[in-house]
């Protein structure tokens, strides 16, 4: 004669609790998105002198990127912005920016634009945030008319 005895160590309540705990952890991870902060200075008082003070920005994929744009120019004509774009689209974006005009902050409605700041007048500081795109190489540029050749850099997302 043999007797089989079965014991159950788990319950439906434990399974549901585990699922709920995992969902909570995921929600916390999303709400604790890392913020990467960068300060970019717009320098120069003439077309020949104007530039951003840093050539590259590197951020992690999916992070929140916080940009502080400081326009250190004194000349009233030196108005700047900073626009993050798909790599290799700078000339296209610059041309479209002129057409889009001041009312759009010289940021064209183009799918190659990732994010862009307000216009910063001389002596003004602008702060804005955006989510870093997928891993890859991108660019940043001032799209104020005539500035894109001198005021540009690379945005690397790791």
Regions found by a protein language model. Name each.
Residues 17-23, 70-77, 111-158:
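Extracellular/periplasmic metallocenter environments
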Residues 48-50, 103-114:
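Short beta-strand and strand-turn-strand segments in soluble, beta-rich domains
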Residues 33-64:
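N-terminal edge beta-strand
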Residues 17-38:
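Post-signal peptide N-terminal segment of mature Sec-exported envelope proteins
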Residues 83-92, 157-158:
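Short edge-strand/loop segments of extracellular domains
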Residues 10-13:
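Bacterial signal peptide processing site
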Residues 76-84:
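Beta-strand acidic-aromatic groove motif in beta-rich domains, primarily in extracellular
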Residues 5-8:
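C-terminal motif of bacterial Sec signal peptides marking the signal peptidase cleavage site
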């Amino acid at each position: 004669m043999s007797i089989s005895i079965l014991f159950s160590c788990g319950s439906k309540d434990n399974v549901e609790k585990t699922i709920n705990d995992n969902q909570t952890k995921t929600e916390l991870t999303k709400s604790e998105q890392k913020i990467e902060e960068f300060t970019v200075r717009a320098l120069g008082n003439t077309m020949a002198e104007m530039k951003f003070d840093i050539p590259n920005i590197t951020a992690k994929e999916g992070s929140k990127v916080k940009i502080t744009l400081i326009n250190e120019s004194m000349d009233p004509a030196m108005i700047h912005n900073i626009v993050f774009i798909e790599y290799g689209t700078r000339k296209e974006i610059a041309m479209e920016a002129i057409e889009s005009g001041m009312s759009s902050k010289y940021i064209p409605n183009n799918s190659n634009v990732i994010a862009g700041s307000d216009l910063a007048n001389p002596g003004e500081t602008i702060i804005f945030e955006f989510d870093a795109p997928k891993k890859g190489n991108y660019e940043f540029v001032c799209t104020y008319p005539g500035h894109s050749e001198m005021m540009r850099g690379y945005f690397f997302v790791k």
